[in-house]
Structures are given as C-alpha cells and as structure tokens.
C-alpha cells in the first residue's frame, strides 16, 4: 500500500472523505545546512517561517492559491456561550428547540413514536439524499460553484453586478462573524465562500438529524416486562460503553481530519498539505461510517426498542450507500488518478515475428512490467476469473459442476425430513468437508510450498505450470463451495422456525446473526478486492515472483482478517439456530482455520517475505498505544505463552505427520455500484411562446468527422440483394453519405441569430428515437453541449465547446446574406453513441426541447475485416494487417487520450483502462463487428496492447476457421460459384 501523498492528486488509499488526515508539509531549507549560531536576524526569519508553517494554503481548480483561515467545530459554535452567535446559529437552535417542544406536547406515546420516526427519516434523507445529490453534482459539474457565480452573490454590490445586495451583506456579516481571523469575505475565492455557505446547510441537517434521533430514542425507550436488575444494568453498561466509544471515534476523527474533510472541503478546493492516516483511521476502514455508528446500537440497547434498532440499521445502511455512491467515486477521481504512462521506446527492427504454433500456456506476461521485445515474443495470458456471480461460465467444467452440486445439495436439504438421522448425516457431511478443506487442502499447499508437489505432477505428464495453476484453482474453488454448501445445508436442517418472534431474545438473535453473516460477506469481498484472484487462490505457492509485500484494503487494519471476521457468518448461524451441532461445526471451523494460518500460511509467508512481514496491524498498534504500561507488559507475556504453545503444537504435529490446514473463504458479493451518469437535460416538451421572434432559416448545423473505411461503405452491396441492387446507388448532387468511424470525434459547426438564447444547446440522438422534427421527446442522456459558456449549472455541458457567438456573414437558403452568430463544438468520449446506427444532431432553443435545426443524418459503422485483401496465407501478413486495422479503432475506443490510447501496436494501454471497464467493452464490441469474434472485456485488459490483442484474434480465427464468415476459409455455406 502506498504511503501518504499530497492532496494535489497523488495515489492514496480511498478511505472516505471523513478519513483523510491532514498534516502540514514542512518547507525545506534552501541551503540544507542549519547554522550553528543564530543572530537576531536569524531568529526573526525563523519566527516568520514558523508563522508560515501554521498557515494552511488552499488551491482552487483554476490554480488560485489562498490562505485557508482556521475554523471551529460545529458543536462549539452552536452550544458554547463564549462563541459569537449569528442569525444562522439562532435559526438552527430554534429548529432544535421546536423538536424538543414537539416531544413534550404530543399527547400520546404512540403519536410521539410515529412523529419522530417520520421526522428522523426526513432529516436522514436530507443528509444522505439531499447532501449526497449536492455533492455528486458539485463533484461532476461543480454545480454549487456555478450557481454562486451565475447569481453573483459573492460580488461586491458596488460594482453593479450583484442583484442581491441585502443577501450579500447578510452573508458577509454571517461568515466574518464566524471566522474573525485571517478571513476576508471580499478577497476569498468563490469556491471557499461557497463551501462556507454549504457548511451552514450541513450544520442544520446534521444537528437536526442527531437531535431527532435522540428524541426518537426517548419516545421509544422503556423497560421490558419482567426484566431483572442485573439484565438492566448490563444493558445500560453495554449501551453506554458503545455510546462513549462512538463519541471517542467522532472526536478523534475530527482531530485527525479537521473541518476541511469533515465538511467535504475537497469537493470545492484542495489544500497543499500531506494526507496521512492516524488514530481511529488505523483501526477500521471508513471509521466515521463503520464503527462511528456504534452509538446507534448502544442507544437502541439502552432504549430496549426494536423500532429504534430497525431504524438505526436503516440509517446505517443509508450512510454506507452515501459512501459508495458519493464519496468513494469522488475520492477515486481526485486522489487516485491513474499515474502517467511510462513510454518505452521499442526497436521494431529487432522484433521477430512470433510463431503461431507456440503454446499459449508457455509464458505469462507481467502486467506491470513492459518490454518491447517481451511483448513481441510472449503470448498474452488468459483472463477468466472464477469468483463472483459475474464470472460464472457454464461452458467451464468447474462452474457447471459447482452449480449442479449446489442444486443437488439444495434439493436434498429441502426435500428430506429434518429427523435426527438426516440431521446427523448432514452435520457429519459438513464436518467432513470442513476437515478436507482444512487438512486436505492444507496438506497440498504445504507440499507445494516445500517441494512443488502439485506442479511436479503436471510437469511429469508434459503439462505446464499454468495448467497446474488452473487445475488447482478449480480444485480449491470446488472444495470451498462444497464446504460452505454443506455447512448451510446442515444449518438448514438444524434450524426450526420460531413460533413467537417476540419471545425472549429470538428476534435479537436473528438480527445479530444476519449482521454477522453480512460482516463475513463484506470481509470476504474486501479480502478478494485486496488480494485479487492470484492471492485468493494462494498464487505465491505456485509462482516464484520477486517478493513484494504490500498492505492495502482490509489488511491495513488486520494481518489475518479471515481469522476472526472471516468466520463471523459461522457464528451468526450459531446465534440463529442455537443448537449444539452448529456450535460444534463453528468451533471445528474456527479451530481448523487458526491451525491453517499458523501451520501453512504463516511458515510460507515467513519463508517468502522474511523480515518484511510486520508484527502488528493498524488496529493492534492503536490498541497498544491506548493500553496502560501494566497491560502492555501483560500483553507481552500472553504473546510469549501463545508463541510457546504454538511451537509445541507444531512440533507435536510434525512428529505425527498429519498436516492440519484451513482457510475460511466465501463467495464474493460486490456491494459497490458507482454510478457516473451525466444529468439528462430538460424534460419539458412544449413550444416556447417567444419562438415567433426567431427565424429558423438562421439556424443550421454542419458536421465534420473521420470518414469510415471503404469496406464499411461498400458493405451495403453484399450479394444478398436483388440483381439491380447489388451495385452502389447513383447519386445526383455533390453531397455524399455521411459515414463516420466508430468512436471518432465529430465536430459540429452551428449558426444562429445574433439574439439567440445563451441557453441554446445541441444534442446527439438516434434518428429513430424522435418522430417529430419540431420537438425532441427523449432525453439526451448526457450527450449534449451548450452553445455558450456559464449558461448552465454544470461544467459537464461545456466539455467540447470550442467557440461561441462569432459573427459571420452567411447566405441563407433563400440567397439572402445575413450576419449570424456561429460556433464550434466537438462531441467525443462519453458524449458519443458507442454503437452502430444512424444519428443526427438537434439544435434546441433556450434550454428547452424546441428544435430549431436538425443536422444531416449520418451513420456510424464498423467495417468488417476483409481476409480476401491479404494475398497468400502467411501468418505474419495476416497479423500485421489485423494490427494495422485494429490500432485506429482502439485509439478511438480510448477517446484518443494520449494518457491511455496507444500510439503504436507495441505500446501498453494506460492504467485507466484497468480501472474503468467502459474502454474494454468498447473494444470488444468493435472486435466483434470487425472480425466476428466475441471476447470478454477482461481479455482486452489482460492483453495490454494492440499486438497481443491481434495475436489473440489471429489465434481465434485459426481455431474457428471452418466456421469463418469469409469465403476463403472453408465452404460450410454455399458461395456464389456453387449457386445454380
């Protein structure tokens, strides 16, 4: 895992906006040598440096640097009598007081519960949906800053440009009262002032959210009937402990991240300081949203209310959705931008053509190391993962076998009766599979680590290391799924449906059990995200790579997350069933898992990585720092006892020769869904009343683009038509059909009257999507550009705009010359359609859907690769032709971005191709249309360059030659020569 990085765009680990610790960057000395004695002048210079180090400098997107003044936290500003109060503070306190009075004056307990449930859900929706939408729009289009600039609310009224002088003076007084030091309302950038106003809105929502939750807890609170004093005391002690822990998490998090990250400051501007992780951020991922909500469950425990518990779970889930949909995409875009591509000069004269008879399994290309010679001589590796529902492939024997066995297990568990005999056999079956998964798999890995037993077996029969690896993955995957399928079947057999959900702790046990199962699923997904397919299947037991150990993802906090969290679902099943048999299976699973880690994984890791293995993870380090000296000494003694015990067990097992091993793994379930969707524009579809003032003859649209290849233009005459239609049609006039390359940028030139609306816009549509030429009745889905800058509330609509309102003299269709406004824009990337078809551009009036002009229809077509154009059947000629045809298509699919699009067939793709799947999906669609071969998107990412992809296409065409669409390859269908 990479270390802390600068906030200006270097790679760091995404931990959530509330997970960024900001520490000042220390300026370096010019001379590099400290003086031995300081005079008066030196002391003055040092004091000045110290003062400058205390200042924080911000940087806006346009490069403006400013001093970020110190601010105080929300609670102190509102509740501390020593802090100055302004109108916004009084307003927030008044709203909070209304909540408290409402609780006091509502007549009945049921009305208080219902009212405050609705009020809390309203404020929670305002937080997660309202603030989330504002931040999403600000992140993608800088919408809030655009609103501020369009309204001119931060412009001094003395300039005559601010139509709201009262609002200006109010905001000036409000903000300068709150920030008395190092702040000037007039001099601060618009981004910073916008953030300060946004903070006041956030203060209102957060305070009301917290207050309404506490009042809802008071309304729901009570003591269960028949509860003893001991249970009451335990419930309150546990609840208070969780609340105090929650309070410590919030305070420590605010100490670490300060107000800048607490209020999502980097959605507006960045600060020139280092970002590090400290305190609570070493304990858990996203602590503000994970352990930072422990207080919800503590309050629910003290209130003894299931209503409060269910709403707490709902609010917590909404907060995770906010993290996944809003914060994580922004952090990935802002801080984890792909690094610049390393360009390597390739000597093409020394590259030898590759023999097509070389086995694909003979070598594997390292995705992170690039060499021109290696790319030319090594074949690309396969990319066909096993884990995850999206990777299920029923053509693969492993997947089909696993699916059939799962169906069999489910049928046996459901259709057989739950008698003691069947229960015994299901529990025995689960125990045997667990023993095999631990002892059997552990023995294989141990022998593989010591003497490459598994690999040697396949080499003995002439197979490669890659074949051994693929077979091992299938064996391990089958064993893992069978282990958990048998455990689930045994749990199902031992489970009895509750007759009364309200009796005792039945409902609570089910809630806690389901939570533990969800925790194990999340842990497994996090482990897979950190390790990948290679690490999940213990790839370092099979491949000798240069040892490089990194701790990322969940491994930043825990050394072996599968030891505890990876088995949480097993103990969740124990809580749900409450049977001795499931407790036995859980104990067996946990014991064998620990033995597997200590006896198989740990020795291999020590042998492979040696001293680079860390002793303590982030969570352990944080806990050790919090322990008093006496407990630290006790912890050291316990560690020594555990180490001695483990050493004794290892010696005993080594003498007995059985090898116990287990690793608890589970299916991966991806809970992240990042939606980056540009806002569709206006949906109102009525004629504007002021259209009569505009002459539609003054509006026009003309297009320029890269013409498609000749094969695409001549494919209309393919021999399938009637005899008269097999030749190209005669055209009268000088205009030819517009047919552009797939993915190539299209330049749009427009004209409009001099008084046209500044909110006019041009959208791209399929011709068949609109039946009317006067009104557009379908959204553009982000494929639109405004004709003028600063006319809409998002910067997204300005991407591609080149020029606007350039006055030219134009001859209209009726021959009359007239001065009109003109402009140019380029549609590229996400503003294009990534499919084949016939399209048109539409010019719309005043931000509405009234159509003023429509462009000529144009076609996007991918020409099929013509094998007949290559003379002979030499592999080198075919491959070179494929490379030549493929390179411009791949460049278009990668938006012609020099950071990711290759300039030569040997050059590696940029790293953004691996992060964003849309690029590889564009390429596989184009390959399918050009060559009739369908690849998975993972293949494009695995190949890494055009040369490897061309080799794969050649190989696929060779394998599928009898079924080729070309007339020269086989005669499975009648050709023209055979037709009678």
From Swiss-Prot:
Please indicate the ranges of residues that lie on the Lumenal side.
1-86, 136-200, 250-282, 327-399, 447-475, 522-566
What keywords tag this UniProt record? Endoplasmic reticulum, Lipid biosynthesis, Lipid metabolism, Membrane, Methyltransferase, Phospholipid biosynthesis, Phospholipid metabolism, S-adenosyl-L-methionine, Transferase, Transmembrane, Transmembrane helix
What's its membrane topology? Multi-pass membrane protein
Q: Where in the cell is it found?
A: Endoplasmic reticulum membrane
Could you tell me what reaction this enzyme catalyses?
a 1,2-diacyl-sn-glycero-3-phosphoethanolamine + S-adenosyl-L-methionine = a 1,2-diacyl-sn-glycero-3-phospho-N-methylethanolamine + S-adenosyl-L-homocysteine + H(+)
GO CC terms, sorted: cortical endoplasmic reticulum; endoplasmic reticulum membrane; perinuclear endoplasmic reticulum
Which Pfam families does the record match to this protein?
PEMT (PF04191)
Q: What broad class describes the main subcellular location of this protein?
A: endoplasmic reticulum
Q: Basic and acidic residues: which segments have biased composition?
A: 40-56, 344-355, 717-733
Listed transmembrane segments: 87-107, 115-135, 201-221, 229-249, 283-303, 306-326, 400-419, 424-446, 476-495, 501-521, 567-587
Kindly tell me the pathway this chain contributes to: Phospholipid metabolism; phosphatidylcholine biosynthesis
Listed EC numbers:
2.1.1.17
Q: What are the recorded Gene Ontology BP terms?
A: methylation; phosphatidylcholine biosynthetic process
- Which top-level enzyme class is recorded in the Swiss-Prot or TrEMBL entry? transferase
Indicate whether Electron transport appears among the record's keywords. Answer: no
Cytoplasmic-side stretches of the chain, per the record, are 108-114, 222-228, 304-305, 420-423, 496-500, 588-980
Outline the segment boundaries, as ranges, of region: Disordered.
1-64, 339-360, 705-733
* One function term, GO molecular function aspect: phosphatidylethanolamine N-methyltransferase activity
Give the family from UniProt: Belongs to the class VI-like SAM-binding methyltransferase superfamily. CHO2 family.
Q: What does this protein do?
A: Catalyzes the first step of the methylation pathway of phosphatidylcholine biosynthesis, the SAM-dependent methylation of phosphatidylethanolamine (PE) to phosphatidylmonomethylethanolamine (PMME).
Instruction: Indicate what this protein is called per its UniProt record.
Output: Phosphatidylethanolamine N-methyltransferase
Organism equals: Paracoccidioides brasiliensis (strain Pb18)
């Amino acid at each position: 895992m990479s270390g802390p990085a600068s906030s200006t765009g270097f790679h760091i680990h995404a931990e959530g906006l509330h997970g960024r610790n900001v520490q000042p960057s220390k300026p370096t000395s010019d001379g590099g040598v400290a003086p031995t004695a300081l005079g008066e002048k030196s002391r003055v210079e040092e004091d000045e440096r110290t003062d400058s180090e205390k200042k924080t400098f911000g940087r806006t997107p346009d490069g403006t640097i400013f001093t970020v003044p110190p601010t105080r936290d929300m609670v102190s500003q509102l509740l501390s009598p020593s802090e100055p109060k302004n109108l916004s503070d009084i307003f927030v306190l008044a709203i909070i007081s209304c909540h408290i009075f409402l609780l006091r004056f509502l007549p009945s307990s049921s009305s208080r519960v219902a009212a405050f449930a609705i009020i809390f859900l309203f404020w929670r929706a305002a937080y997660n949906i309202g603030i989330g939408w504002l931040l999403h729009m600000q992140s993608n289009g800088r919408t809030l800053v655009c609103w501020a600039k369009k309204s001119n609310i931060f412009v001094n009224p003395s300039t005559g440009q601010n139509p709201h002088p009262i609002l200006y003076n109010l905001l000036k007084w409000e903000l300068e009262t709150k920030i008395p030091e190092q702040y000037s309302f007039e001099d601060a950038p618009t981004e910073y002032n916008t953030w300060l106003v946004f903070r006041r809105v956030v203060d209102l929502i957060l305070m009301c959210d917290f207050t309404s939750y506490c009042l809802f807890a008071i309304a729901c609170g009570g003591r269960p009937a028949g509860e003893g004093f001991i249970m009451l005391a335990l419930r309150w002690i546990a609840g208070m402990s969780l609340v105090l822990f929650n309070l410590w998490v919030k305070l420590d998090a605010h100490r670490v991240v300060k107000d800048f990250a607490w209020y999502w400051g980097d959605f507006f501007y960045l600060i020139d300081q280092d970002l590090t992780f400290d305190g609570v951020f070493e304990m858990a991922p996203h602590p503000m949203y994970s352990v930072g909500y422990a207080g919800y469950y503590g309050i629910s425990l003290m209130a003894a209310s299931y209503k409060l518990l269910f709403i707490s779970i709902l609010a917590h889930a909404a907060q995770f959705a906010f993290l996944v949909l809003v914060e994580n995409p922004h952090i990935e875009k802002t801080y984890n931008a792909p690094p610049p591509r390393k360009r390597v000069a390739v000597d093409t004269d020394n590259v030898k053509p590759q023999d097509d008879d070389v086995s694909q399994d003979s070598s594997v290309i390292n995705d992170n190391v690039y060499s021109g010679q290696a790319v030319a001589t090594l074949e690309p590796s396969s990319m066909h993962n096993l884990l995850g529902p999206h990777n299920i492939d029923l053509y693969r024997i492993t997947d089909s076998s696993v699916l059939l066995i799962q169906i069999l297990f489910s049928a046996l568990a459901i259709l057989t009766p739950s008698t003691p005999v069947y229960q015994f056999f299901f529990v025995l079956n689960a125990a045997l599979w667990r023993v095999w998964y631990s002892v059997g798999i552990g023995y294989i890995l141990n022998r593989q680590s010591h003497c490459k037993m598994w690999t040697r077996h396949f080499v003995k029969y002439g197979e490669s290391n890659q074949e051994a690896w693929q077979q091992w993955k299938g064996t391990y995957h089958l064993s893992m799924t069978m282990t958990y399928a048998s455990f689930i079947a045994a749990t199902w057999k031992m489970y009895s449906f509750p007759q009364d959900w309200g009796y005792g702790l039945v409902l609570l046990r089910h809630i806690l059990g389901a939570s533990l199962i969800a925790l194990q699923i999340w842990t497994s997904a996090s482990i897979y995200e950190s390790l990948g397919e290679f690490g999940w299947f213990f790839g370092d037991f099979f491949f000798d790579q240069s040892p490089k150990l990194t701790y990322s993802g969940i491994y930043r906090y825990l050394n072996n997350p599968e030891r505890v969290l990876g088995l949480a679902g097993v103990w969740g099943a124990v809580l749900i069933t409450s049977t001795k048999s499931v407790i036995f299976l859980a104990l067996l699973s946990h014991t064998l898992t620990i033995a597997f880690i200590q006896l198989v994984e740990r020795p291999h890791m020590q042998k492979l990585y040696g001293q680079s293995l860390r002793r303590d993870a982030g969570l352990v380090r944080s806990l050790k720092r919090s322990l008093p000296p006496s407990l630290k000494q006790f912890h050291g003694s316990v560690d020594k006892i555990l180490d001695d015990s483990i050493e004794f067990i290892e010696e005993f097992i080594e003498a007995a020769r059985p090898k116990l091993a287990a690793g608890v793994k589970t299916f991966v379930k991806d809970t992240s869904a990042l939606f980056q969707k540009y806002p569709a524009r206006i949906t109102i579809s009525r004629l504007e009343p002021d259209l009569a003032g505009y002459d539609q003859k003054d509006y026009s649209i003309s297009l320029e683009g890269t013409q498609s290849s000749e094969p695409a233009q001549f494919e209309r005459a393919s021999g399938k038509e009637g005899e008269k239609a097999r030749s190209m049609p005669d055209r009268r006039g000088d205009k030819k059909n517009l047919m552009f390359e797939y993915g190539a940028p299209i330049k749009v030139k427009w004209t409009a009257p001099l008084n046209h609306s500044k909110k006019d816009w041009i959208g791209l549509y399929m011709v068949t999507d609109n039946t009317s030429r006067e009104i557009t009745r379908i959204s553009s889905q982000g494929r639109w550009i405004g004709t003028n800058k600063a006319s809409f509330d998002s910067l997204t609509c300005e991407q591609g705009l080149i020029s606007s309102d350039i006055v030219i003299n134009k001859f209209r269709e009726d021959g009359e010359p007239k001065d009109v406004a003109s402009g140019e824009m380029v549609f590229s990337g996400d503003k294009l359609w990534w499919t084949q078809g016939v399209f048109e551009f539409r010019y719309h009036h005043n931000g509405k859907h009234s159509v003023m002009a429509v462009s000529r229809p144009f076609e996007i077509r991918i020409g099929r690769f013509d094998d007949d154009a290559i003379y002979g059947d030499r592999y080198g000629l075919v491959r070179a032709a494929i490379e030549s045809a493929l390179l411009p298509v791949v460049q278009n699919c990668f938006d012609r971005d020099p950071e990711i699009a290759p300039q030569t067939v040997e050059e590696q793709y940029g790293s953004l191709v691996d992060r964003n799947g849309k690029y590889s999906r564009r390429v596989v669609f184009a390959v399918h249309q050009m060559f009739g071969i369908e690849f998975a998107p993972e293949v494009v990412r695995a190949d890494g360059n055009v040369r490897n992809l061309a080799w794969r296409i050649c190989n696929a065409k060779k394998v599928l030659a009898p079924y080729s669409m070309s007339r020269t390859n086989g005669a499975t269908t009648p050709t023209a020569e055979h037709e009678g």
